[in-house]
Amino acid sequence: ESEITETITADVIVIGGGMSGLCAAMSAAEEGAKVILLEKTNQVNFRGNDYGAIDSKMQLQINNRVDKMAAVQEIMRYNAYKGDQRVVRLWADHSGKVADWIMAKAEKYGCKPKPVPIDETVTPGTTVRGFATLSFRMDPSEVALNDAPKGTDPWTASMRYALKQGCIDAGVDIRYKMPAVRLVRENNNTGRVTAVIAGEKGAYKKFVGTKGIIL
């Protein structure tokens, strides 16, 4: 506590400026929450560009219909039934709506979503059943390409820009170069997480989330 130079309070604190963190931060802000997002680097970060979903508008547009229960069963089999089927089912039931939400954001910022042809998502002749869950790709706008670090894949540039700009427009307070170093918990470090200490030695800040901390 003696090393903390400032305490900042918001409704929600999100740790990490990747795809999940940006989506969480934007969703919370759009619901009226005051949100602070902490990112340890000097920019938002993305690693992948394959977005799996079931029954997104782009998939239905090309009549790509996936058997939800069969997909859930295959995912469970593939992970040797060590995963939580309720979580997998949550994805199967709601991923299409999430994909549509993301695509709407992308279109708002000048990027163009497009469906992925079914024959590009399954392997002919395989003995293992495949599921065409690759839901969409996006062509970036010129602004999105210019905003991305040099060498960024065009699809990734689209997603990166749409979610970052969406957060900015929703009022999310993005703090770059702000690595989380410690979580603060209630009840003598045994209860719920209520705050996060972030920053560099000599300039630590305590971010308190009155409604929640999202990792």
Please identify what each model-predicted range represents:
Residues 5-10, 201-212:
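Core beta-strand elements of the Rossmann-like FAD/NAD(P) dinucleotide-binding domain
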